[in-house]
Amino acid sequence: MRITKPITLYRDLSYFHSLLKSCIHGEISSSPITIFRDLLRSSLTPNHFTMSIFLQATTTSFNSFKLQVEQVQTHLTKSGLDRFVYVKTSLLNLYLKKGCVTSAQMLFDEMPERDTVVWNALICGYSRNGYECDAWKLFIVMLQQGFSPSATTLVNLLPFCGQCGFVSQGRSVHGVAAKSGLELDSQVKNALISFYSKCAELGSAEVLFREMKDKSTVSWNTMIGAYSQSGLQEEAITVFKNMFEKNVEISPVTIINLLSAHVSHEPLHCLVVKCGMVNDISVVTSLVCAYSRCGCLVSAERLYASAKQDSIVGLTSIVSCYAEKGDMDIAVVYFSKTRQLCMKIDAVALVGILHGCKKSSHIDIGMSLHGYAIKSGLCTKTLVVNGLITMYSKFDDVETVLFLFEQLQETPLISWNSVISGCVQSGRASTAFEVFHQMMLTGGLLPDAITIASLLAGCSQLCCLNLGKELHGYTLRNNFENENFVCTALIDMYAKCGNEVQAESVFKSIKAPCTATWNSMISGYSLSGLQHRALSCYLEMREKGLKPDEITFLGVLSACNHGGFVDEGKICFRAMIKEFGISPTLQHYALMVGLLGRACLFTEALYLIWKMDIKPDSAVWGALLSACIIHRELEVGEYVARKMFMLDYKNGGLYVLMSNLYATEAMWDDVVRVRNMMKDNGYDGYLGVSQI
């Protein structure tokens, strides 16, 4: 009978080296710490090569903790293996990988000898851990001591120069790369292209790109990204076409860069499907954001629903888009979904949702969002507080606006501007000027163009021409007259203060007036009783090729209303709908109904109200009732009054109008009846009292 001896596996250092190398490449699931402990339990003694491989394996492992790293360093010290520079370099890399920057710095300082590798390792580690300034300082010292940087070092330094706009420092890195021959390295060249594009040096980026002989996918993506960041859509598309023609592999980054350049998303979506990227969450998220930006919310929702993984960026994009459209009910549904998925909304996303709270009916939603900001800690962010200030301003809640402002630890100019603008929007211009004086007393801050525009709007409210002129002088001294929105505010201020000559002068001084500026001039003429000039201004605007918006037509219809230009009003109203595709608001309908009513065209006015796409409010019916009083049209007036009572029976002005209508026909019994009804509902009929 033959006896077979059991085979024993001979485990020498090479066996453990092989296991550790497998850890580096991710070929086995065992922890490097576990393998190293097995080695120590055997009779084998690790050498400096063992420690170098072990430290590299530990660097790539996600299961290492700071305590274990310190234990490894203790073992190195006891065994004397820490005298080898490359072993200490591996340990330094391990510290940096785990975010122990201070420990890495101490280890570097203790090293009696340093080679190029350890210098590069610490510089790259600083950069990866957010210590870019320290990385730059160390880079300077390294060059002074005669050591040469690696390609990885330069690649890690250039993003810092680009983000901070340090053009001269970035060019210095380029110079070092050229002298050392590292400029030929594709990674360095890509980093240089990205740096120059971030610093608005596209010419230099283009030269580097053209010089590249072997352009990889990363190189093409970098150039497309450079054009995208600069808003050059056509150039980004041209580079992509060249990339496509040369059969270069398209990556998810290619698609993301093109979408950020606002390239048409539908063809790119088709390309994503063809290239099999439909499961890439970053690509799907970018497409969702692109569809949301264009207002294609149905497509955005479907695409988001088809994704295998939820994305906070995609979801907040949909929420913000609905909020921007004013569909707060749907926005709240999606916002609730983020809470159910335990996603944390950031400050930018929350402010986007807050901007959607525009109507008084949104106050409960706005206060709930305020509560979320407090619970999540976002209320400490200046950006969020400014968003809340803007929101409460829309609700005319100036007290809360001032309270929020007082809670700010730091008050940058943007916060002062938010409060000043909020007070003006709420009809509290005097409070806005008090806040402005407080800002000037604090010192250190000077008003900018936005401050001046808000204060000019306050002057318009108060009809304070002298103060408006002082602000105009400040505008000229500080070259703010080049800002269209400041000039628009100046025109509005002069027009509302009755100085249409000066308003015209400001308007004529503008080289290229925008639509808002034309709107301000049209409204100014209308307010000043110059209705013919308002219509001429509108026609001139159209001749210049500018597209009127809904504000333009408010000014034009107001001019037609006050001037009694019925035919012109009808033409403009039709043009607004059919030619420019603008849906009339309640204000447009109120002006048009008032125009028809004043012209005794009551049948047309009623027909217009009946075919409205939106429910008429008291302002629309009130415009017709006022016309009935003027023309003593009792039958239509009573019909309109019944409609208004159904909408708001507590409206004291309605009782006064009905009383006046009956008085024009000497129907005194009805006057008494309406007056009694008014008193029964708590109104005395006095809308104002004079002390004279």
From Swiss-Prot:
Stored InterPro entries? E_motif (IPR046848), Pentatricopeptide_rpt (IPR002885), PPR_At4g14850-like_plant (IPR046960), TPR-like_helical_dom_sf (IPR011990)
Keyword line: Repeat
Q: PPR repeats located where?
A: 12-46, 47-83, 84-114, 115-149, 150-184, 185-215, 216-250, 280-314, 316-345, 346-380, 381-411, 412-447, 448-482, 483-513, 514-548, 549-584, 585-615
Locate the region Type E motif. 620-692
Instruction: Give the UniProt family note.
Output: Belongs to the PPR family. PCMP-E subfamily.
Quote the protein name from its UniProt record: Pentatricopeptide repeat-containing protein At2g04860
GO molecular function per UniProt: RNA binding
The gene name on file is PCMP-E74
Q: Which Pfam families does this UniProt record tie to the protein?
A: E_motif (PF20431), PPR (PF01535), PPR_2 (PF13041)
User: Mind listing the GO biological process terms from this record?
Assistant: RNA modification
UniProt cross-references to NCBIfam families, sorted A to Z: PPR
Show the PROSITE patterns listed in the entry.
Answer: PPR
Per the record, the coiled-coil ranges are none
Which Gene3D superfamilies is this protein grouped with? Tetratricopeptide repeat domain
Please list the disulfide bridges.
Answer: none
